[in-house]
């Protein structure tokens, strides 16, 4: 699976928004299936040197390059080096060695002159995408959304934002992609919904103790009149992680107040997302990128919650007992999803965006679960030989342990 580092490499001094390097695997044990970097169209000298640090580190990890595709921004220019003879490896998802192009629909191509990119615009550019030599496109969220968080605040998981088109437009886009041998990946956001989702509106209207409220994480406050939040946590995007509603209860939001967290102990939440995955799979979607994959299962009934931090990556433990992140129970969810994926021929693929300790990455990438996970050690590593070498080695180790491909 080509590494899709999204916006994270911007934090370490690399700007831009498109896949740059792809390497094709040669064997299960000496593999870097692909590395997606985000480079500025005009590389400054130090950033150019950083590129070669990556290349040297890859070779140092005993990786033999196969085909390499290099591209810059949306105006991606492809070049191909013929692959070397490769050993036959174990069967894995097509994602394992695909060149994947991320599209943010609202900025990619405007087909109507509205000033906003849309689904039909992607269809219009399908010949261009085919010429690049890519094998799949990954669409950032295109669902109805208030856009508090770039579309990751979803108000309806089974529709297209009317500003971007319709389900008919989506079907046309899928057909155009498949006609050219291009697969389609979409984002799924299962940790939270938009506060404008019908379920959350129903939860606010129904009141404490209702089945509607059980779909989200509502708690009574502390203090004599419940005026204090249930815990002392701050959200990942800043500010308190709890918001109080009119009847006095508080709801949890790991990111923004407009993104209330689902309660995954509720069977209705499980059923909703199995239906969502089937809905898009039935329409021809080939794969799913799972947002905040490590954050679904939570334990808020323990007595020591105030000593933990909500921010991703803080206080991480290696035994799956953190109350908020990377809990062992999350893997029951993904085994359930794998049963949905495997109903299709070919089975649908998935990749986890899971910010977890390197030694636990492989759990998400097991064939019985999502099958792939991003190796964010690349995003966190400094642009030095030692750091990149270590990140690659950790990724290869996780790949061997999970019978998946390194990302």
Model-assigned labels for residue ranges:
Residues 354-407:
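Noncatalytic carbohydrate-binding groove/subsite architecture in carbohydrate-active enzymes
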Residues 7:
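Extended, structured, electrostatic nucleic-acid-contact surfaces
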Residues 85-278, 282, 295-358:
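Acidic/aromatic-lined carbohydrate-recognition and catalytic surfaces
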Residues 3, 16, 24-27, 34-35, ...:
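Short, positively charged low-complexity motifs
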Residues 137, 288-290:
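Hydrophobic residues within beta-strands of alpha/beta enzymes
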Residues 16, 337-341, 395, 399:
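Hydrophobic, Leu/Ile/Phe/Ala-enriched alpha-helical segments that form helix-helix packing faces
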């Amino acid at each position: 699976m080509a590494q899709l580092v999204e916006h994270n490499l911007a934090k370490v001094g690399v700007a831009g928004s498109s896949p740059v390097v792809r390497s094709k695997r040669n064997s299960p044990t000496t593999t870097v299936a692909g590395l997606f970097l985000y480079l500025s169209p005009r590389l400054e000298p130090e950033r150019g040197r950083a590129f070669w640090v990556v290349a040297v580190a890859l070779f140092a990890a005993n990786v033999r390059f196969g085909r390499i595709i290099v591209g810059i921004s949306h105006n991606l220019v492809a070049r191909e080096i013929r692959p070397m003879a490769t050993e036959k490896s174990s069967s894995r998802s097509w994602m394992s060695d695909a060149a994947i192009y991320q599209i943010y629909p609202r900025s990619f191509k405007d087909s109507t002159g509205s000033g906003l990119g849309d689904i039909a615009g992607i269809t219009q550019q399908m010949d261009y995408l085919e010429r690049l030599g890519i094998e799949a496109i990954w669409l950032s969220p295109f669902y109805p959304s208030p856009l508090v968080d770039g579309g990751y605040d979803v108000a309806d998981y089974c529709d297209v934002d009317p500003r971007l088109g319709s389900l008919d437009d989506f079907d046309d886009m899928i057909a155009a992609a498949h006609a050219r041998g291009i697969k389609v990946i979409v984002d799924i956001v299962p940790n939270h919904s938009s506060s404008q989702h019908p379920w959350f509106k129903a939860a606010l209207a129904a009141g404490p103790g209702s089945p509607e409220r059980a779909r989200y994480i509502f708690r009574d406050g502390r203090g004599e009149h419940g005026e204090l939040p249930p815990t002392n946590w701050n959200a990942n995007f800043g500010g308190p992680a709890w918001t109080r509603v009119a009847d006095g209860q508080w709801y949890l939001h790991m990111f923004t107040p407009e993104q209330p967290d689902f309660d995954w102990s509720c069977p209705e939440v499980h059923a909703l997302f199995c239906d969502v995955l089937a809905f898009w799979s039935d329409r021809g979607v080939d794969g799913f990128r799972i947002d905040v994959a490590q954050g679904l299962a939570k334990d808020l009934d323990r007595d020591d919650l105030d000593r933990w931090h909500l921010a991703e990556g803080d206080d991480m433990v290696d035994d799956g007992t953190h109350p908020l992140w990377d809990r062992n129970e999350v893997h029951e969810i993904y085994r359930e999803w794998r049963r949905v994926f495997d109903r299709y021929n070919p089975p649908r693929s998935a990749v986890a965006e899971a910010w977890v300790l390197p030694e636990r990455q492989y759990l998400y990438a097991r064939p019985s679960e999502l099958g792939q996970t991003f190796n964010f050690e690349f995003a966190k590593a400094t642009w030095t030989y030692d750091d990149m070498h270590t990140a690659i080695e950790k990724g290869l180790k996780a790949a061997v342990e999970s019978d998946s491909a390194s990302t």
